[in-house]
Regions:
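N-terminal membrane topogenic signal
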Residues: 1-10, 48, 202, 232
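Alpha-helical transmembrane segments of multi-pass membrane proteins
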Residues: 13-28
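Short aromatic-rich membrane-water interface segments that cap or initiate transmembrane helices
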Residues: 34-47, 138-145
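Membrane-interface transmembrane-helix boundary segments in multi-pass integral membrane proteins
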Residues: 39-44, 170-187, 193, 212-245
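Membrane-interface helix caps and helix-loop-helix hairpins in membrane proteins
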Residues: 94-108, 166-171, 192-195
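Alpha-helical transmembrane segments in multipass membrane proteins, preferentially the mid-helix core
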Residues: 118-127, 152-166, 180-195
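Central hydrophobic cores of alpha-helical transmembrane segments
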Residues: 200-211
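Non-transmembrane, juxtamembrane loop and terminal tail segments
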Residues: 256-281
Length: 281
């Protein structure tokens, strides 16, 4: 069953790449049509090349070198593989809905995608806590999914803004956009501080910097909101960067102590007498 799911995921992933490639010329214009004030500059979306490259490594490793796959060591490996299959289907579903202007359905699909990736990411960080960091497994199996999940966090919040703007028929208030950016910042800081996940933090910085340097030409009222949002994005990127430096420094400077716990201690009192020469205690 495990091998079947691994190959099914590879097939679904290839199909996902085909669907993305076929729709690549449509997604850009649709994104500009439903652009929000927290949508990063166009160059930021080039991160998909990185994501798809390392996700390819994830599914290929699971098929051919399963000992390096984070799926294999999981007690519920088949459930995790099924969740990855769901993520592929939701990715393709989002493309179909969004390119056909079903904005609300696209957002709902993205939420399901987020939950499936969150479950996979939660397993990765839990296993890393229990078994330690393995550089090979990280690069060839975990990295693609970590970056994918981090970017999906940003994309889901942007999609919420798209839906809200679509319903309102106008841009949102400054506080609404700042609230969405705050959710991204808090989630990222949690990953960096509690899990030491530098990769997650770097993806968030990429999205925030892409927003901070974005150039817009809007009416005066909206342009003022956009300027404030870019200032918030700049500040958030700086804060996340600072905590990444702190996390890395802490890792480098904290000695890795390994203690061997005592299996048993000498009894303080027992029924059996202890001989000390000719004297008994």
């Amino acid at each position: 069953m495990a091998a079947l799911l691994s190959w099914m995921n590879l097939a679904l992933y290839v199909l996902q790449l085909v669907v993305n490639g076929h729709s690549s010329r449509t997604i850009g214009p649709m994104s500009r049509r439903y652009e929000t004030l927290i949508t990063p500059a166009p160059y930021a979306f080039s991160i998909w090349g990185f994501i798809y490259t390392f996700l390819a490594a994830t599914v290929i490793v699971d098929c051919f070198w399963s000992s390096l796959s984070f799926f294999t060591s999981a007690p519920n490996a088949n459930v995790l593989r099924t969740l990855f299959a769901i993520s592929c289907l939701m990715n393709m579903g989002w493309i179909v809905f969004f390119t056909n202007e079903y904005v609300n359905a696209a957002t709902a699909t993205l939420v399901i995608l987020w939950f499936s990736l969150f479950a996979l990411y939660a397993h990765i960080v839990t296993e890393r806590r229990d078994t330690g960091f393995d550089i090979k497994r990280f690069v060839f199996s975990e990295l693609g999914l970590t970056v994918y999940f981090a970017w999906t966090c940003a994309a889901t919040l942007i999609s919420f803004a798209v839906t809200a703007q679509y319903v309102a028929g106008d841009y949102l208030s400054l506080s609404s956009y700042v609230a969405l950016l705050s959710v991204l910042s808090v989630g990222t800081l949690s990953a960096v501080i509690y899990e030491g996940d530098v990769a997650f933090g770097l993806v968030a910085i990429w999205a925030l910097v892409g927003l901070a340097v974005k150039s817009t030409t809007l009416e005066a009222r909206v342009e003022l909101i956009a300027m404030n949002i870019r200032a918030c994005a700049t500040q958030s990127a700086a804060i996340v960067s600072a905590f990444i430096v702190i996390a890395i420094t802490h890792k480098l400077l904290t000695p890795n102590r390994h203690f061997q716990p005592l299996q048993s201690g000498a009894p303080l009192y027992g029924d059996k007498p202890i001989g000390y020469g000719t004297t008994h205690a």
